[in-house]
């Protein structure tokens, strides 16, 4: 029996000395810096680049071009005036949202839903993500002209 105890004790071998290269100490939760929140204003996240619009055209030709964009991009499949379809009612859109916010939502809806609290609430209430339809910077003023012409 003593032989067994001797063999077991010797089999353990020497214990390594603790070194400073061992696992790093874990910081207490209070010492870990919090992730900063993104501050978003009424225009949406400013890291989404948009074309600055000095003026939204209101002439009939621009409004007509905007309707073509609205139809070609399939906007009417989800949006209407005076009623809610899949997406929000567009009546009075420019009185509820800023032009930069609308541009950002149309041109980068995924980022808006992730970073903008208003877009997140719209996503929650409508239960569907607005798809990115590829509206170009050149098409945007015409699309806004059409939307604004339909009702404020």
PLM region descriptions:
Residues 111-131:
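Short, flexible, glycine-rich and Lys/Arg-enriched loop motifs at helix boundaries
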Residues 10-14:
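Bacterial signal peptide processing site
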Residues 66, 72-81, 102, 143-147:
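The canonical Cys-X-X-Cys-His
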Residues 26-71:
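Electrostatic cytochrome c docking/interface patches
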Residues 100-105, 128-152:
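C-terminal capping alpha-helices of c-type cytochrome domains
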Residues 1-8:
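Sec-dependent bacterial lipoprotein signal peptides
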Residues 19-24:
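Juxtamembrane extracytosolic/periplasmic "stalk" immediately C-terminal to the first targeting helix
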Residues 63, 67, 80-111, 131:
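Gly/Gly-Pro-rich "capping" loops immediately C-terminal to redox-active cysteine motifs
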């Amino acid at each position: 029996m003593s032989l067994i105890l001797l063999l077991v004790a010797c089999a353990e071998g020497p214990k390594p000395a603790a070194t400073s290269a061992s696992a790093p100490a874990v910081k207490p939760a209070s010492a870990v810096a919090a992730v900063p929140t993104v501050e978003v204003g009424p225009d949406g996240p400013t890291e989404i680049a948009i074309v600055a619009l000095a003026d939204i055209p209101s002439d009939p030709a621009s409004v007509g071009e905007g309707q073509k964009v609205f139809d070609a991009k399939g906007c009417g499949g989800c949006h209407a005036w005076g009623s809610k379809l899949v997406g929000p009612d567009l009546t009075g859109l420019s009185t509820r949202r800023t032009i930069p916010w609308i541009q950002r939502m149309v041109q980068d809806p995924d980022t808006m839903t992730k970073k903008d609290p208003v877009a997140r609430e719209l996503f929650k209430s409508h239960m569907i993500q607005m798809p990115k339809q590829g509206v170009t910077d050149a098409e945007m003023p015409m699309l806004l002209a059409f939307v604004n012409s339909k009702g404020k």
